[in-house]
Amino acid sequence: MLEQRATRAGFVLALFSAATFGTSGTFATSLIDTGWSPAAAVAIRISIAAVLLAVPAVVTLRGRWNVLWHNIRMVTIYGLVAIAGCQVFFFNAVQHLSVGVALLLEYMGIILIVGWLWIRNGQRPRRLTIAGSVAAVLGLILVLNLVGDTHIDLVGVLWGLAAAVGLAVFFVLSAKSDPDLPPLAMASGGMTIGAVTLLILGVLGALPMHANVDDVDFAGHQVSWLVPVIGLSLVAAAIAYVAGIAATRILGSKLASFVGLTEVLFAVLFAWLLLGEVPTAMQLLGGVLILAGVALVRIDEFRSGTADPGDSHTIARSTAARDLG
């Protein structure tokens, strides 16, 4: 009973994380349309989020700096690959591919996770997981409106696949992280490392950094540039990453990554509500397929009960169940 409540809490956190991540496109678009470079938008997003999370992270550590130090290698990889790397790879991909194709390649990270669990833990994908993967990928193709002619470039494909690795690392490290390391501390540490990396790349000229303080068009209104910047940093970064880590610790990397696909559905929803971009019938069908894929993977895990007692997400689920009780 308590574990069921913990799992439900994990689903709520995962959907909340996906929804907050889904706002990033709307916030970033308003900045990019006024002359901001994508890299500058990402850099300020991560930098401010790192500052916002610093004090809460220190409070949750309660002086246990040794916990952070013992996990410094994992936090560093998380910051470099899952935060900074993933976004840099994606924006390099969109220089050679359409945004839809780049997103599809990035979300192939869920397939990488299934493969990783097979290779690393011997969790061979069963029929329901395979069916869920196929349904989810088909749903992505429809939601991202990739039916028809699309431009494919090998360099862009490689960057997109690198972004997929970054996405997979996000879920895998979030699931296997030390339960004693608070999600706030993990997110804050990773964002600090990611922000410093992005800023260094910008100073070196490896990433184009262009920004201004002009008013932006957001939700049909002219507002200060600070509105989307705060939205990107607080909602689409600080809150989104912390909720994502907490959810993945409860659900595990595979299930959490499939639930994370709903980010594209929330992105379409926010684009409709705030930018007036009405979703098509094919996109709605794609959304149904994505949700069906998530349901199939959840049913598969429920039937099999394959989580090992020592898995981080099993420990986290037990801890959450205790706290909920």
Predicted regions and their residues:
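Glycine-/small-residue-enriched transmembrane alpha-helix faces in small-molecule transporters
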Residues: 1-44, 149-176, 197-200, 313-325
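Specific transmembrane alpha-helical segments of multi-pass solute transporters/efflux pumps
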Residues: 20, 54-102, 106, 142, ...
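Hydrophobic/small/kink-forming positions within alpha-helical transmembrane segments
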Residues: 22, 79-84, 88, 110-115, ...
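Hydrophobic transmembrane alpha-helices of multi-pass small-molecule transport proteins
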Residues: 53, 108, 115-116, 125-146, ...
